[in-house]
Amino acid sequence: MLVVFTSYPIGFVLAGVAILFGLIGSLTGVFSLVEFFLFTSRIWFIADNLQIIAVPLFVFMGVMLERAEIAKDLLETLQILLRRVPGGMAMAVTVMSTVFAAITGIIGATVVIMTLIALPPMLKAGYRPELALGTIAASSTLGILIPPSILLVFLAELLPMSIGTLFAAALYPGLLLSALYLIYIGGYSFAVPAAVPSLTRTTTTMGATQIIAIIVRGVLPPVALIGMVMGSILTGFVTITESASVGAAGALLLAATRGKLTWHNLQESLHRSAMMIGMIFFLFVGATCFSYVFRVLGGDDLILALVDNSGVGSWGILLIA
């Protein structure tokens, strides 16, 4: 933890600490050098796993949709639909983050995108900085829970579990957490009206045709893509890799229909995807090495003993966690 607070890349921290304590364990006779060099076989297992191909495809899908300005259009659409609700822009950001979490599956991408496109308009509209930043920071982290979360893909490979089953199990808690965020924003806006801008009465009204047109352009494309990707995974119709391929192809199709599929945007999307994928995979490699040394040195047994002897019960463990 001390090294993590130095802002050094977490992947390097985990791998470095694992190697350091692995060498200490070898010198003290906890495990042999043969067991120590099992690092290489574990890393090769990651690289040789065909299911992991879904990770770069999901990353590219999210980056390509961001370059096609899908996120910007979706946020503007939600702001229009929620313009008469107290704290409507903050709620729009939360809904937008939920949808984009289901597109990218990465926290970092959602945080960066939402900060760039949502924070300036919220501050300009009169939202308190703590509410604006808190909304973005909290809702952007839904990408770690809502499928297709990249973490869940890796977790399914580490555990003997089906990816579709794990996605289905994580979907409802993620949506519930998003709903709780919306309830909190509504309650906070009612209790502290100074934290949100006052509702302005507008003389212009929108007809049903205009509202439908806005929804079709801003909401329908990303929701349809999410439904296609997630539906194919949860029903077991295709594998996770095939579903990710469909998502990447769908992102390219949406970009083409909006006139954003240019050579420059494609190059930028591939470059950003490669940078993010490298970071993600090295983080996973470091975490794999760290967990291996942690188990060999008896870390799992120590935690289980602490939990068993704590006497706080299952609800107490839940509160502590």
Region locations from a protein language model:
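Alpha-helical transmembrane segments of multi-pass membrane transport proteins
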Residues: M1-A321
